[in-house]
Amino acid sequence: MTHIRFIVAVCLLGLFGLTGCEPAPVAPSSSNGNKEVPQATTPTPGDAGAATSESGATMYEGVGYALPMKAGKYEILGIRTDNKDSSAAKTNAQASLLAHPDIACMVGLWAYNPPAILSALEDAGKIGQIKVVGFDEHPETLQAISDGKVVGTIVQQPYLFGFKSVEYLAALARKQEVKIPEDKMLYIPHTSVTADNVLEFKANIEKINAGEGDLPASDRTDYDITNTVKLSFITNSIDPFWVLAQKGCEKAEPVFNAKVDVIMPSNGTVEQQKQSIETFINNGGQGLAISPINPANQVDMINQAAAVMPVLCQDSDAPESNRLFYLGTSNYQAGRAAGKLVKQALPEGGKVMIFVGKLEVLNAQERSRGVIEELMDKPE
């Protein structure tokens, strides 16, 4: 049976957030007559690989572009980060509305971003006036698509992330062959959910959450599953997205005779992931799938695990580590798909702002770059 652990940090001074014990955000503001103006959370050079030039443009090094910039008919205003805090995400959206009254589209690249954007638009009375493009299958986002408040969302297949992670790790732990591409990238397709297919998609999600998801196809039918293997699936946070991945792990357990410990760090910190890995190693773990929070600073941690067991990265990659391969979405192509939704919503062009949790995370960089290069009409 799958074991699910939520890693909770001790909070001081009575501060708490929406999940676990993350400190509650204090939205900064500046005085503007009698109006309190929300201030956006912008990347700093040390925090998110961004640096502000003398011209005022911000160079997002992980993304590869200085913003704001013109992209054909579109003007990409910037990328707002929120440190995985939904309250800060809403503050960012509010600040963007005030700073850019003529903004035409807001693109949220992590699951909680579209609901935060919608909340800001609701407060401002601008639902329907500004287009919203999302990412992932947050229930509020799906409902908003049904209600005509969101253009669409790009969805991954976390259910398959869980199932295939267990399949491959169980085989590798037993020294059985897994076909790994030369580039060490095993992609699981993404799709676009719009008003045309949202009801069908929601019905499938409900089936998965009820434990009635379809059994995915395995790569092989001749796996030796004689001995039970002990695996760990570590996420980067607590989110409905990861509940779907957990359901995939549960579906895979009896198929591949595996015991899977699904760990969801409540605060989404590197320290929590490190603690979980060390505990898993000490308890005789045999295979690890992880979504790295800060890949550049987690190489040693991942290598420590890879020295004693097979390790793969899922959802977000750490390509400089000794992980065997990456399993998940092509985040760049998914970003381009989000850019295509922007084009459909704004065929005449307009101003676009991108919102995401942390630009230190590789999937955030790749999705952002995909959106930008699609709006630029850069060849794929």
Predicted regions and their residues:
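Bacterial N-terminal signal peptides
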Residues: A9-G17
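A residue-level marker of the well-folded mature domains of exported/periplasmic proteins
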Residues: C21-E380
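Bacterial N-terminal signal peptides that target proteins for export
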Residues: M1-V8
